[in-house]
Amino acid sequence: MSIKHYDVVRAASPSDLAEKLTHKLKEGWQPFGSPVAITPYTLMQAIAAEGDVTTPVLVKPSDGEGTVISATRDPEYYFVVVLAGQSNSMAYGEGLPLPETYDRPDPRIKQLARRSTVTPGGVACKYNDIIPADHCLHDVQDMSRLNHPKADLSKGQYGTVGQGLHIAKKLLPFIPANAGILLVPCCRGGSAFTTGADGTYSDASGASENSTRWGVDKPLYKDLIGRTKAALKKNPKNVLFAVVWMQGEFDFGGTPANHAAQFGAQVDKFRADLADMAGQCVGGSADGVPWICGDTTYFWKQKNESSYQTVYGSYKNKTEKNIHFVPFMTDE
């Protein structure tokens, strides 16, 4: 056969290898040779593809230095996942980015642009362009200027680390092979409903970086709904899949008792404002789009137990409204 792409699959056991190969076969790959045990705990299987595939392919540049990702095929349409809230929902991870391995981008995972370049000093982009997603997404607060002290910027280890890329990677096996994930980052560290500065909003650039106040028709909300609609308008086949929301700590110092009502009003307004695009929402209506509300860390939970129960407790028991709380840890 005429091989266009090569890659390898690593696994910890025969069953793990079989599961991973099943996914690869669906993506257009074929086994190339037999599996090899490279350590007592690691199996490796070479794979190859004659045509386009839907996963990233590692290739060496002609000078033999470094590793880059070869684009294969752009998705025909996207499942849109909106990321919103405060620091827990964005790139506040202080660890060293690993863009060649663990934080490796995937050509099926994109994001809506906000900054003027895809990466610091990189390719130019405009607000709401579709660009590759990596470990440091284009949120309201720009974290790309903060680098780990041991970062090698020549390897793309710029900025801080978020979980958006990894949420999308978890979803890829469950969507059609010709589809991708389009992330819409709208997070701002330190933001709240009951305290903080409104900031400003522009259709041309979104919410200003000093915007730290959520609520109906606040600049952060306008950024959220505006970018969500922009993502859907990119392609009539795009589908709004979910809103991943993580927010609450900064309301501990505001008026915690008012948080639940303001959050609920914002969800209702978001869904009402999407009524004209219901056909592009999962389930055929804006009410069908789940809000996935993440927990806070143990530190905040322990330090502010009463306020925690008021704010984060309000996310619980709302499944009938398609609002789902995901605990950071299981209560004993």
What kind of feature is each model-predicted range?
Residues 1-62:
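Terminus-proximal functional modules
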Residues 59-332:
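Cell-envelope and extracellular/periplasmic
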